[in-house]
Amino acid sequence: MKMEEMSLSGLDNSKLEAIAQEIYADLVEDSCLGFCFEVHRAVKCGYFFLDDTDPDSMKDFEIVDQPGLDIFGQVFNQWKSKECVCPNCSRSIAASRFAPHLEKCLGMGRNSSRIANRRIANSNSMNKSESDQEDNDDINDNDWSYGSEKKDWELKVTLPFILLSYTAKKRKSDKLWYLPFQNPNSPRRSKSLKHKNGFSVCTSASNTLPLLFSSSGELSNSDPFKYNNSTGISYETLGPEELRSLLTTLIFLFQQCGVISEHTKKMCTRSLRCPQHTDEQRRAVRIYFLGPSAVLPEVESSLDNDSFDMTDSQALISRLQWDGSSDLSPSDSGSSKTSENQGWGLGTNSSESRKTKKKKSHLSLVGTASGLGSNKKKKPKPPAPPTPSIYDDIN
Amino acid sequence: MVVSKMNKDAQMRAAINQKLIETGERERLKELLRAKLIECGWKDQLKAHCKEVIKEKGLEHVTVDDLVAEITPKGRALVPDSVKKELLQRIRTFLAQHASL
């Protein structure tokens, strides 16, 4: 060790330089040797020439450097001008706006989507030439059919919408209620539905059917049919099938438990005293479908006219029978149920209506009033009937 | 006299190499050189040269000795001056540090 120190310190600069060069050459040779081993291994394993390409293909995949083109030579702002056609409303929408539009149009979002759908259907029906009628029908059938096989949400949206008109008459204001029903091009819309008592109700062939009825109690109640008309107003604007399924649900709620199961999403079909569900659950379901004024049926009979009373329900039943007897397939459970009760419904019909006359809470429809004069005729309703004419016609 | 001097030189070299390896400086220098050579394209140049040699000799008949004989002179020549200078500088500093001991 001592000798080593001596030798190192005794070296002059030229010797040190020579040693440095030697070390450097050593290192370079090391690197070269390492590289040679690397290449040799690559050759023997057969991957040395893998990255070789011929000049032709090199030219093919050259990077393009021109204004307006990306490095592959494609025009990169093509998508800006692209437009997609909505499969639902068949409008063309800019590609960047298409996803939000589709969400609204197909009803994936909130309730606003359904409003949008309705608006589209309305505007389509205003100028029918825009889209073919088949399309329209399909859309509207989806909107307005709530058979038992339908999903819950359809029931949820549509039922309260119609029942709004029903419960609205309970309030003693003189408000007029517009219900912009849409189902523009459906052929059943133009049907003239014949009432059991020989009274024909005019349904409109016009596409947007503004339902106008008043909840005033001061209308004359001499006509026994008036009550029927008033309860049936909103339903008569529906097609027979729609009406039936709606009313079937209503009847269901008055005869059976009806609590919606969490697992099956179906309504309980047991009696009102069904032990599996509590009264609270039953009440919740009724409030859900019929609005806050609805209560359990057994309680209802003892309540005053602020509640949803039995006479109303029976009138509804009678309407259902009228409907069920029209042109429905007997295979459906709803219609078969109604036909069972038909005789009873007819019998109680007039008496019930007389009872309710005294309660002075009635609705009347403009279209029906005019329909009284022109019996059994197809007569389109005026799109927005003037308010005073209601009272004139009725009185 | 001459023999003893030669002997002394050899001893000195051995001692320096020992020191280089012990301190790990040799490994560091090697790594630095490799990085620098790849950076400056030395490796790619050599590779191109390798391809020529291999095509000349035939893929199956290439040996490591052939490659070393062909490549090493070229590799030495192709090292850029900047890399050479930097490396020599590092070696000199190392020697200066350990010569003072």
Curated annotation (Swiss-Prot), chain B:
It is found in: Nucleus, Nucleoplasm. PANTHER family: ENHANCER OF YELLOW 2 TRANSCRIPTION FACTOR. Keywords: Acetylation, Activator, Chromatin regulator, Isopeptide bond, mRNA transport, Nucleus, Protein transport, Transcription, Transcription regulation, Translocation, Transport, Ubl conjugation. One of its GO terms (biological process) is poly(A)+ mRNA export from nucleus. It comes from the Eukaryota. This is Transcription and mRNA export factor ENY2. InterPro entries: TF_ENY2, TF_EnY2_sf. One of its GO terms (molecular function) is chromatin binding. There is a cross-link at residue 74 (Glycyl lysine isopeptide (Lys-Gly) (interchain with G-Cter in SUMO2)). Belongs to the ENY2 family. Involved in mRNA export coupled transcription activation by association with both the TREX-2 and the SAGA complexes. The transcription regulatory histone acetylation (HAT) complex SAGA is a multiprotein complex that activates transcription by remodeling chromatin and mediating histone acetylation and deubiquitination. Within the SAGA complex, participates in a subcomplex that specifically deubiquitinates both histones H2A and H2B. The SAGA complex is recruited to specific gene promoters by activators such as MYC, where it is required for transcription. It comes from Homo sapiens (Human). The lineage of its organism: Eukaryota, Metazoa, Chordata, Craniata, Vertebrata. Transmembrane segments: none annotated. Component of the nuclear pore complex (NPC)-associated TREX-2 complex (transcription and export complex 2), composed of at least ENY2, the isoform GANP of the MCM3AP gene, PCID2, SEM1, and either centrin CETN2 or CETN3. TREX-2 contains 2 ENY2 chains. The TREX-2 complex also associates with ALYREF/ALY and with the nucleoporin NUP153. Component of some SAGA transcription coactivator-HAT complexes, at least composed of ATXN7, ATXN7L3, ENY2, GCN5L2, SUPT3H/SPT3, TAF10, TRRAP and USP22. Disulfide bonds: none annotated.
